[in-house]
């Protein structure tokens, strides 16, 4: 548990990775994409504090020991949620697979939740794989990458009939949480394939699923906010927003947080470090201390200690049925974490 000024914070890192991106895993003939992808990822790390930057060699292939130290020993995290990204067009064994993540999780019981993924372009074979992964690893969530390349296709939409087939199957298998990458583009993927409009469509038609929009739709923050405020089952995943903006662009971060707090609300926001792009320690410590930098942001809702506790762990804990220690529970008057009616626009109406 992270403790600051007598307050205890239960931390759930709801978006992190354990990837393998070294040259030995590059698909022959696609080396330029595998190399370019991980170099683009590495460039994002420069948006964090200088003392947290890694050499590219470590970044490509950090170890289990690196992860356990950075995330749990030094990083204040109590439970971490693996979000897989396959990219098998470029990485022979996959970039960051369910199997790789789950193998680490099985070595450290109670510390990880292993989500899986699907790609509706994989047809019946993909449905079989989804079912097998849920049964094998007990996954309660999926990570979707709508801009991923697949056999000549450079993306899909959640509103596609094929995607609906998979969403129905996932729901029937007990999946509750759908994490969708809708944020900054990584070379060579297409920016438009990360547009948030398809989430609006799917969230309406699958009200029993929670759609966590990772990276809050950046750079489409206003599109995301205006959609999420009227879709009760759409949540804001703050990975990249905190890691990429809090240190490097504090005023822009304040605007992003202000818009999210006004339209979406503190009950529908979840922390994610996006490790190994950024280490969680500085993000958590900085967010606990964070406030708007000037009166320029006076028309946005304030974020107090209770709200920070929700965002840093209690909201995700409720979405994933994670037991929270009694000393980290909020009093009833602080509201219910992960409640679907918390947007400032709604409560103020």
Label every model-predicted segment.
Residues 22-28, 94-95, 127-129, 154-156, ...:
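Short aromatic-enriched loop/helix-cap "lid" or pocket-rim segments at secondary-structure transitions
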Residues 62-69, 96-102, 126-130, 196-199, ...:
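Alpha-helical scaffolding within the catalytic cores
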Residues 15-21, 181, 215:
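Histidine-centered divalent metal-coordination motifs
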Residues 15, 105, 133, 142, ...:
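Conserved, mostly hydrophobic/aromatic
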Residues 140-141, 155-271, 296-307, 330-334, ...:
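Catalytic pocket-lining loop regions of alpha/beta-barrel enzymes
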Residues 18-19, 184, 218, 277:
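Short active-site segment of divalent metal-dependent hydrolases/proteases
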Residues 79-193:
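Active-site gating/metal-coordination segments in enzymes
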Residues 1-14, 21-71, 79, 128-132, ...:
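Mid-to-C-terminal alpha-helical segments outside catalytic/metal-binding sites
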